[in-house]
Structure formats: C-alpha cells, structure tokens
Amino acid sequence: MIIVTGMPGAGKDEFVKVARSLGFMDLHMGNTVREYASRNGIPDDDKEIGNFAASERKKFGMDIWARRTAEKIESDELTVIDGVRNKEEMDYFSKFSKSIYVVAIFANRKTRLERILKRDRPDDIRSMEGLIERDNRELSWGIGNVIALADYMIVNDESLEIFYERSRKLLFDHFLIRA
C-alpha cells in the first residue's frame, strides 16, 4: 500500500494518475471529505470544507478520514491512498497492509499556487493568502510529520512530463517488482 502526501497543489493527483495507469487502485481522502461535507450541507468552498474536516477530527479523532476512506479498500496490493494528513491516519492504514510506504510530493509554494489556480476546483483557494492559510491549517493537522516520515520523495518543480517520468520510475523500481 502506498500513501501519497504533500501540500496542496504539489502534484498528488498527478502521481495517482500515473499509478492508476499502471494498475493501482486509488482512493482519495479529499473525495471522502467532500462526500461527507456534501451530505451534511457544507458549501463547496475551501474554508468551509476545511473547517468541516477539522471539526470531524475533533469530534471523532484524528484518524476519522482514514477510517471513512478505508471502508472502500478492496485489497492492500497495488493500492494508492492520496491525502493522508497526519500520523494517526498513517497508523490506521497500517492495519490493512503489512507494507505501507509513504511517498511525499514536494513543490514550492509559488508553483503550487499556479497549479491550483489552473485546476480551478470549486473548493480551491484563489490567492497566495488563501494558500498560506490552507498550508497552515494542513500543517496544524500534522501533514509536516507525514512528509518528514516519507520513505520516498519526488520533487515536482519541472514539467509534467518529467514528473510523470519520475513517478513511473519510482513505481516500477520500488513497487511493481514486488507485485
């Protein structure tokens, strides 16, 4: 099982696209948060969804989004989970697999903002100030610890083609040989 982490806009979704093209099953914790937020009438906006996610963590524990996402796990083999934000979520997923590997995706803040503005998701931030606020919120949840504990890191500061190449190489060299 691979856990993908990184700050907003770093390239986690693009890594997952590469993994999916190689036969990995993918689960997105952010989709789980958005699904639950929608069911609870939360507006599709970054701040509202972020507050909802934080509130649920406070009520039900830091691993609540891992528990809710895990309901969709079919097998631990060739599974990529995108969006782990804290060590408690990592620990929860370790119950499903004898081998958990964390891949951190890194890009600088300016590059991440440019990417976020291009992807134009309804719940995304629209300014550097908004990105700084979101980064601080995610850091308060413990994402920095997950990144620091990563088994592998891919720096995503060049073209998409180079990032895809780095992602494929990592997946082939470290994960597909074992499958």
From Swiss-Prot:
Domain of life of the source: Archaea
Keywords from the UniProt entry: ATP-binding, Nucleotide-binding
One Pfam assignment: AAA_17
The keyword ATP-binding belongs to this UniProt entry's keyword annotation: yes
SUPFAM superfamilies: P-loop containing nucleoside triphosphate hydrolases
Keyword Transcription regulation: no
TM annotation in the entry: none
GO molecular function: ATP binding
Residues annotated to bind ATP: 6-13
Family named by the database record: Belongs to the UPF0200 family.
Protein name listed in UniProt: UPF0200 protein TV0279
Organism name: Thermoplasma volcanium (strain ATCC 51530 / DSM 4299 / JCM 9571 / NBRC 15438 / GSS1)
